[in-house]
Swiss-Prot record:
N-glycosylated. The keyword rRNA-binding does not apply. It is found in: Secreted, Extracellular space, Extracellular matrix. Residues 64-87 are annotated as: Disordered. Expressed after injury in the carotid arteries (at protein level). Expressed in brain, lung, and after injury in fibroblasts of the adventitia and the neointima of the arteries. One of its GO terms (biological process) is osteoblast proliferation. Glycans are attached at residue 188. GO terms for cellular component: collagen trimer; cytoplasm; extracellular matrix; extracellular space; neuron projection; sarcoplasm. This is Collagen triple helix repeat-containing protein 1. The keyword Hydrolase does not apply. Its main location: secreted. Induction: Strongly induced in carotid arteries after injury (balloon catheter injury model). By various growth factor (BMP4, TGFB1) in NIH 3T3 cell line.
Amino acid sequence: MHPQGRAASPQLLLGLFLVLLLLLQLSAPSSASENPKVKQKALIRQREVVDLYNGMCLQGPAGVPGRDGSPGANGIPGTPGIPGRDGFKGEKGECLRESFEESWTPNYKQCSWSSLNYGIDLGKIAECTFTKMRSNSALRVLFSGSLRLKCRNACCQRWYFTFNGAECSGPLPIEAIIYLDQGSPELNSTINIHRTSSVEGLCEGIGAGLVDVAIWVGTCSDYPKGDASTGWNSVSRIIIEELPK
């Protein structure tokens, strides 16, 4: 193999072109200067040689590598794929029940009297007004005070609560009774015992808002009344408390 030669320089090519041009002129007939057609033909050949030389492209040295271009714009989204297969059936879960209870704020009230000394046998003894906050709650009521009943013959008295003028119906009235039977007229009928007692219970079904809670005294069914006394010589009180159901 022969070693590769160097590329021809521009000066060498120019020299070769001039020599070629000179040869063309020398090869032209001497009568060319006298014959216009021949002269014109020679000029055309010279121009062809010049055009051929001008059309030659010389390969220069390699240029500096260019910089990376800017990233292209995002392409068009592809079409949706084929739906996958159904997964395996999961295990049976457990049912959890959670109860969210509203926080409860205590709501209660007490009305008290130092000495009622109420000697009526029928009617309202005392009253206490209470503000009930919820409709789905219950009221716990308590009356505490001295009670007394006396009579010559068998008698019965009943102490009970009312709510806005009506006895409790959820579920039943709240009451307490005292029954007294001397047994015979010969026995002492002047027994006069005052004893601290209580009337207490829960009542449901009362709407929210103001509730007038009262303690009353009345008769028992099928029995005559006696001589009743409430709150003698001692403190009496009504306590009302709202409770969640």
